[in-house]
């Protein structure tokens, strides 16, 4: 898998992702080793205690008002399609839902239930752009299904012709 073709929150494509900013994050799987007095050189049993997780981090660099509102909450100023500003939220905001990441290599990662944590960051200079620094906290879906999966992209026009034929359910 390689290359980000599109990132969506629900049905909304959230804009350009800064080159080199995507990191899967998360944690490695955890286990407990069981040792025996009679076996000094290795554990006699390893018990898995937690699966590996992902917690992607990335930076959005296409800062139109709709993208800002999509990941930070708050209020858009103006009329639909002709927004003239954005106001920060006045109350605690939790934005959760389905995320999809289409890869250039021909796969799509679907996260049915993730909470976005984001802030305005970066630098305000003529050589860099401001950005929305984002982290997805992947949560268990309410229906008990997998927290994320990776499959061949349904709309192959978004991916390159080098897509892999097999899908991976995680």
Indicate residue ranges for each PLM-predicted region.
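Short, flexible beta-strand-to-coil junctions
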Residues: 61-63, 102-106, 141
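Solvent-exposed edge beta-strands and adjacent loop segments
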Residues: 1-68, 115-131
């Amino acid at each position: 898998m390689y290359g980000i073709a599109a990132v969506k929150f629900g049905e909304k494509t959230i804009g350009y992702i800064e080159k080199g900013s995507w990191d899967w994050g998360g944690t490695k799987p955890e286990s407990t080793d069981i040792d025996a007095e009679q076996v000094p050189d290795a554990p006699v049993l390893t018990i898995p205690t937690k699966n590996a997780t992902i917690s992607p981090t990335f930076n959005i660099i296409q800062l139109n008002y709709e993208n800002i509102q999509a990941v930070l909450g708050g209020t858009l100023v103006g009329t639909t399609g002709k927004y003239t500003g954005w106001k920060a939220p006045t109350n605690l905001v939790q934005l959760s839902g389905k995320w999809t990441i289409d890869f250039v290599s021909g796969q799509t990662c679907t996260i049915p239930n993730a909470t976005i944590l984001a802030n305005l960051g970066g630098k305000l200079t003529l050589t860099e752009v401001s950005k929305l620094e984002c982290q997805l906290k992947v949560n268990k879906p309410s229906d008990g299904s997998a927290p994320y999966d990776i499959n061949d992209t349904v709309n192959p026009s978004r991916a390159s012709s080098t897509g892999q034929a097999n899908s991976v359910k995680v």
